[in-house]
Amino acid sequence: DPELKSLIQNTNYCIVDSKHKISLLEDYAEKKLPIVDITPFDTRADFGISQQLTVQNILVPIDTIEQSKFEELIVLFASYFETNETARVHFFTRNANWDRVDSVLNFTREVLKVNGLDERLARKETNDKAEFDLDEEKKVPIKFFVDQCVDELSISKCIREQRIMVDVTARPDLYLQISCISSAIPQIVSFNTQYVHDAKNGFIVKEVSEVLNGLKYYLDNITNWNKCMIYSYELGKEYNTASLIRKWKGVMKQVEQD
């Protein structure tokens, strides 16, 4: 769009929500620009309740995930369950469709079946007591869940119960990344942003297969998880309300001078 390009080229100031977008915008405008990155979300120290739970919840955003990566993740998690009985996967979706939960679980079961794995790991939760009277069912606890979160309140409640986030989508969810910093939980991501520092508050992976090492590093070793919690707490200070206000004041002052 020539009009948009001209507008950006002649602007006095640009605001982006993360540092990685600075180079993208300058490449588009074909010139250096007066840009500052300010996250649209602030951090609020809220360490959640994951340490109080008897299970280790793994949050996995899926709304923009490639199907091949989704399939690979499902198989990887099923394999990880064999060595970590307390691990539980929570597929995260903002999709409010009435059949979203069923469609995700159906897909998960199909992938498990095709790969010779127990599809009961992804059966739907039910209040029907008759199901649990069966000895066989008791031996196979549900390990795949779908968290359908359509507002900030439900997302916040969901994050508080997670032990780690695994996001291998091509577009990072900044709200989730900031929320993970607030809750001080590790993040395994495939997209490099300033909110995840490799080997500090998470890992940046190139291949889905690398996720397994990250899970073992943080979920099988409480010391590593605690180090991440401390680092996340310090990192969160860079994006708290006071820090964002200072940045905005700096922008306003610069604009007034121009």
Regions found by a protein language model. Name each.
Residues 217, 224-238, 250:
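A short, well-ordered alpha-helix in the C-terminal region of glycosyltransferases
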Residues 3-33:
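A short, active-site helix/loop in glycosyltransferases that binds the activated sugar's phosphate group
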Residues 20, 37-47, 95:
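Short beta-strand->alpha-helix junction loop in the catalytic core
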